[in-house]
Regions:
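Short helix-loop-beta connector
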Residues: 32, 62-67, 88-94, 156-157
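Short glycine-centered segments of the SAM/dcSAM-binding site in methyltransferase folds
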Residues: 36, 94, 118, 182-183, ...
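A glycine-rich, Thr/Ser-enriched phosphate-binding loop motif common to dinucleotide/cofactor-binding enzymes
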Residues: 63-85, 99-101
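Glycine-rich beta-strand-centered segment in the early N-terminal region that forms part
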Residues: 2-44
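Glycine-rich phosphate-binding loop and adjacent beta-alpha segment
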Residues: 123, 169-241
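A structural motif shared across PLP-dependent enzymes of the aminotransferase-like
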Residues: 41-54
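Adenosine-nucleotide cofactor-binding segment
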Residues: 97, 113-173, 221-227
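Glycine-rich NAD(P) Rossmann-fold beta1-alpha1 loop
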Residues: 76-77, 99-106, 164-168
Length: 250
């Protein structure tokens, strides 16, 4: 595939694990057996037991279910880092979310609203657009005639931030829809197509194209990563955000 992390096969999949601590390693004082925690690992979470570095383990609020905790890790962590650190999204700005009904897209919609942005989501079907609206999007658009629709929805001004986990043809539409000094976030390539960018669009709009590699952020800025998680947990506890879980299995 095109994803940048490629562990050697065979390997156990899964990045998020939540449960109670069984044992702690030497020098670990912030956790003890019985604590409710969630952990992030590079892979191997789909197992009965998981070992994780203490810097990747986080204490859970008593009211947070384990499945919600897992949901908040990768997809929500990616969207939060993208909008908080990479885009520096501000209240009152307009946020465009491509792939709005995907896991990171739905997270970006909710986080954008929590920050105070106006959110325009894009998704490929009526059902998916309904999911975007349920997650808080102010507007949900199809990909067809997207360029004209964005002009209409922004009064010709464009969007301040575009969140793109899809790539492909929609990337250029987003690049053309940027407001002056807008920030176009390169989050992923779910379409399977890594797009090319006409650099003159960046020049003319004085916009920025900003990469988002959450896995690298987690490894290089663990203290800020922990701070991000605290904000997500606080929002969840206060019902500012709500995860969307399709199905849970024992």
């Amino acid at each position: 595939g095109l994803y940048q992390m490629k562990p050697e096969t065979p390997f156990i999949t899964g990045m998020e694990a939540a449960g109670t601590v069984e044992t702690v390693g030497p020098g670990v004082s912030q956790f003890k057996p019985g604590d409710r925690v969630v952990a992030m690992v590079d892979h191997g979470a789909y197992a009965e037991k998981v070992s994780a570095p203490a810097t990747r383990v986080f204490a859970l609020p008593d009211t947070m279910p384990f499945d919600d905790a897992c949901a908040l890790m990768c997809a929500w962590g990616t969207a939060h880092h993208a909008l908080r650190q990479r885009a520096r999204l501000q209240s009152g700005e307009t946020l465009l979310v491509l792939g709005g009904a995907g896991s990171t897209g739905l997270a970006a919609i909710s986080i954008g609203k929590a920050i105070g942005a106006r959110v325009i989501a894009v998704a490929s079907s009526d059902t998916k657009r309904a999911a975007c609206l349920e997650s808080g999007a102010d507007v949900a658009l199809p990909y067809e005639d997207l360029r004209d629709a964005l002009k209409r929805e922004t009064g010709g001004r464009g969007v301040d931030v575009a969140f793109d986990p899809v790539g492909g043809a929609a990337f250029e539409v987003a690049a053309r829809a940027m407001a002056r000094t807008g920030r176009l976030l390169v989050v992923g390539f779910a379409s399977g197509e890594i797009p090319k960018l006409a650099a003159n669009l960046v020049l003319l709009k004085e916009s920025s194209v900003v990469g988002v590699f959450w896995g690298n952020f987690v490894n290089t800025e663990p203290e800020l990563y922990a701070e991000n998680n605290r904000e997500l947990f606080d929002w969840h506890t206060r019902s500012v955000i709500r995860t969307r879980i399709d199905e849970s299995r024992p």
